[in-house]
Amino acid sequence: VGSEMCIRDRFSPILMGLLVGFFWQILVMFGLHWALVPIALSNMTLVDGNGLLIGEVILTAMLGTTFAQTGACLGIMVKSKDAKLKRLCPPAIISGIAGVTEPAIYGITLPKKAPFFRTCAVAGIAGAVLCALGVKDYQMAGMGVFSYTMFISPDTKDIHPMIIGIVVSIICVIVAFVLELV
């Protein structure tokens, strides 16, 4: 499976980013996202002919999911007239920032259906953009705001991929927020 994921990444990183980004939250719902983590860890150990880490894109492609969920919860909190729903949003937003999307998924976006699929679309586009820009992760890190350090190559110490990840995250929050207000 790991070899298949590498082949897909080499064939079309944009398609790989789109698919992983879009389906990550659906995989989370069934607990199947954990099946991709060992593949990502294995891919992180691959080196090029010069002995430099080549990085991997599975965890890169899922970066937008937490921020899309966070933005959607912000939008729902602002737009909703339902007091109970408004009370559910702040804890889900805090969890989303920290990379835990289950409260947002199960408590807010999935029951409303459309916001869930909008966040999948935003995350898929974010994954495609990150992979198109050549952003890769090189080590394990937390999720959400704690994930940015995984984009710094231990070989080159280049922080540009991390900055791209931060910008894409902010855009995900804004786009998902606006989509809920429209």
Q: What kind of region is each of these model predictions?
A:
Residues 3-4, 8-11, 15, 19-26, ...:
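Hydrophobic alpha-helical segments of integral membrane proteins
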Residues 4, 9, 91, 103-182:
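Transmembrane alpha-helical segments and their short flanking loops
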Residues 8-19, 30, 49-58, 81, ...:
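Membrane-interfacial loop-to-helix junctions in multi-pass transporters
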Residues 21-33, 49, 95-98, 130-131:
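Transmembrane alpha-helix interface/packing and boundary motifs in multi-pass membrane proteins
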Residues 22-26, 73-77, 104, 128, ...:
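Alpha-helical transmembrane segments of multipass membrane proteins
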Residues 29-36, 81, 135-139, 181:
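Transmembrane helix-loop junctions in multipass membrane proteins, especially transporters and channels
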Residues 35-39, 68-80, 170-182:
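Transmembrane alpha-helical segments in integral membrane proteins
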Residues 41-125:
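Helix-loop-helix junctions within the multi-pass membrane cores of secondary transporters/permeases
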